[in-house]
Amino acid sequence: MFIGITQRLICNDSYHEKRECLALDWGKLFNKDLFKNFTPLPLSYEIDFSYYKHLIKAVILSGGNDLSFYSPNVLSKKRDLYEKQVIEICLEEKIPLLGICRGAQMIAHYFNSHISPCENHIGKHEVFFSKEKFISNSFHNFAIEKLGEDLVELCLAKDNTIEAFKHKYENIFGIMWHIERENGLNNIQILKEWFSLIKE
């Protein structure tokens, strides 16, 4: 089963070329037993997402690039427009959607959450989930302070910013840590819940 993944956008100045890319960590992640039933399908921003929707069973909005709302550059704007379409089609077609770091921020922003600059979210830190806590990686300059009314928190950081959430009614989850990087799978309960929504 294919899981579509949005990609980071970069500009290679020496070649005057805009590029889509995914970290090699994503390939390593899909080699793990947890992902053995799935194959990643990188999504191109030059191909309308409606073309992909019949090929995939779920979508991951990956990390990289700040939202254009906070970093108004051409690449961020292009990515925001595409991922907005992805969210809307996933809602229409009931396609399970997972946001990772920037992807979680994109979903949170779409559903009217409050996002602001943060400090001390680089490296690793404690995450509080129900009555448990675990260590996760952390690589973001913006944090979700308050969720929109359609979203519910699942995990918090020590500063009470949102580390994970889900939609109250739709098949949508957001995680602020990078599942593909070191300390990304120290707690997989939320990931397993999202997997349970994916139908063959």
From Swiss-Prot:
InterPro entries in UniProt: Class_I_gatase-like, GATASE, GCDPHdlase, PuuD-like
Catalysis: reaction(s): N(5)-(cytidine 5'-diphosphoramidyl)-L-glutamine + H2O = cytidine 5'-diphosphoramidate + L-glutamate + H(+)
Gene Ontology biological-process entries: capsule polysaccharide biosynthetic process
Disruption phenotype: Mutant does not express the MeOPN CPS modification.
Active site: 101 (nucleophile), 178, 180
Domain Glutamine amidotransferase type-1: 20-200
Metabolic or biological pathway: Capsule biogenesis; capsule polysaccharide biosynthesis
PROSITE patterns in alphabetical order: GATASE_TYPE_1
Record GO terms (molecular function): hydrolase activity, acting on carbon-nitrogen (but not peptide) bonds, in linear amides
Enzyme class: hydrolase
Domain of life: Bacteria
Enzyme Commission identifier(s): 3.5.1.129
Function: Involved in the biosynthesis of the O-methyl phosphoramidate (MeOPN) group found on the capsular polysaccharide (CPS) of C.jejuni. Catalyzes the hydrolysis of CDP-L-glutamine to L-glutamate and cytidine diphosphoramidate.
The protein's name in its UniProt record: Gamma-glutamyl-CDP-amidate hydrolase
Species assigned in the record: Campylobacter jejuni subsp. jejuni serotype O:2 (strain ATCC 700819 / NCTC 11168)
